[in-house]
Amino acid sequence: IREDMVSRGLGDVYKRQMNLTLNDQQQKITGSETIIYHNNSQDKLEYLWLQLDQNKRAQGSDSYKIQTGNIKSLNTRSIKNMEPEFEGGFNITNVTKKDGSKQAYTIHKTMMRINLDKPLLPGTNFTFNVDWWYNINNRMEIGGRSGYEYFEEDDNYLYTIAQFFPRMCVYNDTEGWQNKQFLGSGEFTLPFGDYDVKIAVPTDHVVAATGNLVNANEILSEEQIKRLELAKKNEKEPVFIVNEKEAIKNEKQRKKGMKTWHFKAENVRDFGWASSRKFIWDAMVVKQKSNDVLAMSFYPKEGNPLWEQYSTKTVAHTLKCYSKYTFDYPYPVAISVHSKWIGMEYPMICFNGGRPDEDGTYSKRTKYGMISVIIHEVGHNYFPMIINSDERQWTWMDEGLNTFLQYLTEQEFEKGYPSRRGPAYRIVDYMKGNKKRISPICLLYTSPSPRDTMS
């Protein structure tokens, strides 16, 4: 672990190695991980906590108990969401210590506690392994921040995958463990770490993920490698690594076998990825004073012509504007992935909606809605992915800062951009709304200084 990570006062930092397999026939993920957890706090830790977000969909989950509504709010998705046959949630198959012996643990709903044999002293580390699997949810029917979209016309799946592994909770010096249950609507509190992830997918799939692709020479064709290198030099227009014609050909094939994509990411608080044989892939470089960033997009043909015209250019524009107003983007890539009806962010990668009609036409509302969601979700790389606030407790922190910068970025995209937010008068309708749905901004610090609310 690098000294700069420790010197910033992070309560905990860890290294993680993961091996994942995507079963495209059963829509299932199987994974194993090795976690090296460093206790950088001043406290002895009697146990460690991990987050099991997929247990939100397990039978008996508390998330079902808090959902409210009325007959007027019922729609097809609501009815589908009531169906009990989806068997969601993590299936933890093995937890072991570094030497392979059994590690004691306790699962409580969306949290898992690692019961240590002896306290983990300050400045020491603990290594353990977890094996698991879970069924991927059909996001178009039962919703979710991640899942799959099924394309019936060509019998293909597009996977946008997140919260897919047992994730470390945060331990800080003011509150201890942040182990509030995940009910679905709240977001996340996460520590920084280094990720080494191998993802086995069908051999004809294209994968996008947090971090650098480190085995491109093994999985990409010579032509694709040439295109990728060209994209790293092109600042004006995106370069297609996989174009639409190639993607259409690819989605019609069913090649046998699996291929492993290998990604590494340093100093990130989470990991997300996407996989499909439908993906078109384009990229261009954004040059900064401190480093170059590869802006990329992955999308099915159903996203065109909108996505090939605007997605990657919007990613690049967002990086330039946010970096101008804040700091240079420190990561090597920034990725926009298209799936329908979504807007969700993870380090270096985000999942965005905005789809033309079936005939390829689209309204101004669709166009600007797509551009705005890309700006917003790419912008979340700065808040909270880099400025690491506690989303579970203080959602307004990252959303407020990000929405403000989103407005500035939209106005620089083109003159007269139809921003939904920005000027003060735009908040009036919200403030006049149902008071039961308006949460006050409360600073619930547990010490006189707010220094620990952001890492």
Protein language model features and the residues they cover:
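Single conserved hydrophobic/aromatic residue that forms the stacking wall/gate
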Residues: 1-10, 14, 445-455
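Early extracytoplasmic/domain-onset interaction patches
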Residues: 2, 11-51
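A surface-exposed beta-strand-loop module
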Residues: 38, 73-151, 249-255
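Glycine/proline-rich low-complexity spacer/linker segments in large multi-domain proteins
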Residues: 60-74, 133-195
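Catalytic Zn2+-binding segment of zinc metalloproteases
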Residues: 381-392
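Acidic/His/Gly-enriched intrinsically disordered linker/tail segments
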Residues: 399, 403-447, 451, 455
